[in-house]
Amino acid sequence: MFKIALVDDSVILRSAIRNVLESSGFEVVFEAGGSAELFSKINGSGVGLVLLDIFFPTENGLDILAKLKKHLPAVKVLMVTGLRQDTIVAEAQRLGADGILFKPFDTDELLSSIHRLLPKQGK
């Protein structure tokens, strides 16, 4: 099963995303409110995808992305942001983001963004 981590400072948003993902058959391994919690939980968790917010009250999601890709380059990262700014999108891509999802998004957008990042499996 594909394992997902949710990293956002909004507990409400994390809970809503978790409900959608789990009802769609995904396993949410853990949630984190920031980088310290993310890095304390991710090693050995088997996470294949991190949904990562870009804006936090005390840190920058792009910095978290850079650190995550440096330490765990195989983990896919889907950035989540409410700001549609070309420079931010370009920087996220440069740092290794595997996709960007813009808030507000609906269930179909969330699931299709994740499905694009799933490992391809032969049937």
Model-predicted regions and their roles:
Residues 57:
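The feature encodes the CheY-like receiver
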Residues 11-30:
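Two-component/phosphorelay signaling modules centered on CheY-like receiver
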Residues 31-49:
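Acidic, metal-coordinating helix/loop segments flanking the phosphotransfer/catalytic sites
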Residues 63, 84-99:
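Alpha4 helix (beta4-alpha4-beta5 surface) of REC/receiver domains from two-component response regulators
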Residues 34, 60-63:
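Acidic catalytic/metal-coordinating carboxylates
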Residues 87, 105-115:
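C-terminal output helix
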Residues 62-74:
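Short amphipathic alpha-helix used as the core "switch/output" element in two-component signaling
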